[in-house]
């Protein structure tokens, strides 16, 4: 599928969604979801849907979620991302519900990289307030998505010095999750720390030293292993004592 085709499909699907014709909209989209369509093209469809009225878009996205296709989570994630400026609180409520509905790692990661991740990049402080309850959510996938969002922010930061203070804020934010024990959630937390360590290695080394050496906090070996991935030998020694 070419970009123009994806945009045209998105416009057609969005028009049906806005008209309240949910079944017809999904029938139009379903063949594309069944094919090997790139996430970028699916994202264009999602953006078109998300640009429309919230109520009809939500009804359609719930229909997409019920089908459970991998590509469907991309459409949902990009649609929610398109709604962030209009309804940030509502988007986070809906995103959490979709993460729980997905109940699988790739659905969680797709949504985490398209909703809370970009929200952190766009507006860090208000987003942290919305994301804070997810750190201790009863659902492991919701907790995992916090780490995915931090990974996305770190990737976009590219290690620029001007973002160092924000990186410090994010390390403080994920500190309560260092003792996460459920392995699916641990992988998300570790991913976030790994990418922060890639771009801000000294910062992460000092932070790990506080958790591991000074406070001797209980943690999964996987969490620490991922966090150490991009650190130098000297930084690893500093981090682990």
Locate predicted features.
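Alpha-helical scaffold domains
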Residues: 1-241
């Amino acid at each position: 599928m070419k970009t123009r085709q994806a945009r045209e499909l998105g416009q057609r699907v969005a028009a049906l969604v806005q008209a309240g014709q949910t079944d017809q909209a999904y029938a139009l989209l379903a063949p594309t979801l069944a094919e090997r369509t790139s996430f970028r093209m699916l994202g264009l469809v999602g953006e078109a849907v998300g640009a429309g009225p919230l109520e009809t878009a939500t009804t359609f996205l719930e229909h997409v979620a019920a089908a459970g296709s991998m590509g469907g989570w991309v459409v949902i994630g990009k649609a929610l991302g398109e709604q962030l400026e209009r309804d940030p609180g509502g988007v986070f409520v809906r995103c959490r519900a979709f993460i729980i509905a997905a109940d699988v790692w790739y659905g969680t990661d797709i949504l985490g990289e398209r909703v809370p991740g970009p929200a952190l990049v766009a507006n860090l402080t208000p987003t942290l307030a919305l994301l804070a309850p997810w750190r201790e959510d009863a659902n492991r996938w919701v907790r995992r998505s916090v780490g995915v969002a931090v990974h996305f922010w770190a990737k976009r930061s590219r290690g620029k010095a001007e973002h160092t203070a924000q990186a410090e804020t994010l390390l403080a934010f994920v500190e309560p999750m260092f003792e996460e024990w459920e392995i699916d959630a641990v992988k998300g937390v570790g991913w976030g720390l790994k990418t922060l360590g890639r771009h801000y290695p000294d910062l992460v080394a000092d932070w790990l030293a506080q958790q591991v050496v000074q406070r001797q906090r209980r943690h999964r070996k996987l969490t620490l292993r991922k966090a150490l991935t991009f650190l130098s030998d000297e930084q690893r020694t500093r981090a682990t004592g």
